[in-house]
């Protein structure tokens, strides 16, 4: 008969089991699956004209034929209309001896072109196939196009007629946030001539920053691309531009346009330049929280948010579209006025929900990680990071981002978030345009 009072294990054995369990838990935590994020490899060289080239590649792209090429420029100017018009003309029928747009010409070659601009950065992009039957003719066409584009008067006149009277919201907010407030704020359009467009495109060549290549290249493909880049950039010069002359408005203000019901609120705020990956993560979570929080307001239809993370004068802007009748909405018995959040509220760190609610923060961070696991597999996303988030002459380069973003994500805490927002946001610069109709 067994003795039920006898312990199953002796004390030394029990101590050993407990120690083993503790070590096992520690090892499991140590080896717990972290974010499934790839780390791109980076190779660098310079063109024959001295322009830096950065090539990003990763194992996940070995079977992909997608290649991204980005020509990044640093032409600092307050004349945003001139930048917009020049790049729009470039994307039109600017290929010499052609009446088709550049994308119409590139489409049969499984390629496309695009552009990006802000008050400090400009980018001309090509998405192309690395297959030789497409690659060679695409690069030949791109070389002819970018070396000496032909800006046609008829196309210029048509574009001016269509766009001059309705400048983008981005331009309007930049004028309010950054430019001389003594100017007429109702005059957000700037007259641009075709000669100015041609001259500005030539000036871009003297403002080159970096050329980025993202995607898989065989040794033969790499040499073909290098030759094309050398040809395109043979008269490029490195930029020495500075945004020190551009100052953001340090006193918050609200501008009202038209009369009637409140239709839109357009907001802008200056930011401190992003100098670390955790600061970039913080802005992404803050932005997601801002959009989600405002979208939950009964009187708001939808919210759009965008970041311009330029190297010296970054900023954020968002556009709120209100319900058809905001007055009726806020006067309904079901409307909870105590939960009203204004367009300006979330520029103050202490009023950001995810700063004060750990659960809300964790949810936003988890959602961000899931999105990132998909985005980081895309060469296009890495092209965006290279040209619009990191800066080769700034505090955060694409190489630093690629090497450190996984660890930054995995170790990111709410304390990191709170500290970063306190540093990044400049509430005193907040500018608001209320549009009535």
Language-model regions, residue ranges each:
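Charge-rich, well-structured scaffold segments of protease-associated domains
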Residues: 2-29, 104-240, 301-437
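His/Glu-rich zincin catalytic helix
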Residues: 2-105, 206-299, 432-437
């Amino acid at each position: 008969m067994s003795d039920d009072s006898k312990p199953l294990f002796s004390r030394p054995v029990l101590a050993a089991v407990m120690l083993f369990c503790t070590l096992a838990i520690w090892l499991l935590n140590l080896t717990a699956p972290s974010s499934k994020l790839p780390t791109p490899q980076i190779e660098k060289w310079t063109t024959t004209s001295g322009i830096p080239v950065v090539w990003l590649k990763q194992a996940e792209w070995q079977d992909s034929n997608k290649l991204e090429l980005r020509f990044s420029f640093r032409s600092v100017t307050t004349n945003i209309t001139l930048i917009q018009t020049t790049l729009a003309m470039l994307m039109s029928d600017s290929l010499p001896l052609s009446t088709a747009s550049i994308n119409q010409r590139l489409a049969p070659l499984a390629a496309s072109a695009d552009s990006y601009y802000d008050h400090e950065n400009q980018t001309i992009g090509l998405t192309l196939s690395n297959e030789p039957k497409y690659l060679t003719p695409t690069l030949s066409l791109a070389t002819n196009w970018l070396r000496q584009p032909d800006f046609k008067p008829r196309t210029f006149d048509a574009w001016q007629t269509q766009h001059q009277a309705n400048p983008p919201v981005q331009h309007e907010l930049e004028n309010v946030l950054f430019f001389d407030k003594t100017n007429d704020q109702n005059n957000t359009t700037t007259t641009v001539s075709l000669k100015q467009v041609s001259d500005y495109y030539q000036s871009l060549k003297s403002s080159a920053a970096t050329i980025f290549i993202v995607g898989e290249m065989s040794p033969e493909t790499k040499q073909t691309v290098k030759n094309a880049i050398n040809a395109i950039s043979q008269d490029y010069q490195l930029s020495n531009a500075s945004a020190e002359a551009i100052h953001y408005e340090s006193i918050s203000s609200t501008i009202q346009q038209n009369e009637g019901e409140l239709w839109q609120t357009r907001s802008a705020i200056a930011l401190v330049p992003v100098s670390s990956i955790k600061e970039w993560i913080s802005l992404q979570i803050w932005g997601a929280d801002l959009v989600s929080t405002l979208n939950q307001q009964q009187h708001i239809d939808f919210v759009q948010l965008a970041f311009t993370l330029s190297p010296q004068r970054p900023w954020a802007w968002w556009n709120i579209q209100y319900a058809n009748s905001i007055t009726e909405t806020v006067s309904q018995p079901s409307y909870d006025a105590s939960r009203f959040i204004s367009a300006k509220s979330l520029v103050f760190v202490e009023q950001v929900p995810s700063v004060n609610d750990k659960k809300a923060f964790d949810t936003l961070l988890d959602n961000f990680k899931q999105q990132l696991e998909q985005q980081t597999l895309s060469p296009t996303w890495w092209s965006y990071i290279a040209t619009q988030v990191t800066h080769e002459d700034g505090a955060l380069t694409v190489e630093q981002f690629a090497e450190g973003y996984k660890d930054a994500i995995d170790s990111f805490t709410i304390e990191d978030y709170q500290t970063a927002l306190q540093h990044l946001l400049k509430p005193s610069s907040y500018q608001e345009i209320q549009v009535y109709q």
